[in-house]
């Protein structure tokens, strides 16, 4: 592993431990050339995913880009970073276990919205507004109507 401070390849792992859900290994490292300490994270990657954008361009799947877009949707919302990380891991697992190495950005968006809907309604609407490219207030009304009908259905099930 290359040192982020001096670019030396002479580094050593000082401590390794799994995260709470055991999906990632956290490693503390030290550079033997400059004594700089840094942390790396290691996770299993089942397959290389390629995203097919709306314009037809193909780009490698970027987990960090997904995290950033969700952080924007969740800005100022009462959601713990751990819950966000769990959701992102679940989305990535679903994508990787889907059997396809290429997946459309639309399919990724739908999967993300499915998970986000369970996490936070406001973030769901924010994400939907960008993903579905809302142009008018009625676009928001439609999504809010979906959420309202889901809430009514859940309440009816609880009464039974």
From Swiss-Prot:
Keywords: ATP-binding, DNA-binding, Metal-binding, Nucleotide-binding, Repressor, Transcription, Transcription regulation, Zinc, Zinc-finger. Binds 1 zinc ion. Negatively regulates transcription of bacterial ribonucleotide reductase nrd genes and operons by binding to NrdR-boxes. The gene is nrdR. Residues 1-20 are annotated as: Disordered. This is Transcriptional repressor NrdR. GO terms for biological process: negative regulation of DNA-templated transcription. Its cofactor is Zn(2+). It comes from the Bacteria. It comes from Rhodopseudomonas palustris (strain BisA53). Belongs to the NrdR family. InterPro entries: ATP-cone_dom, NrdR-like_N, RNR_NrdR-like. A zinc finger (unnamed) spans 3-34. Residues 49-139 form the ATP-cone domain. Residues 1-11 have a biased composition (Polar residues). GO terms for molecular function: ATP binding; DNA binding; zinc ion binding.
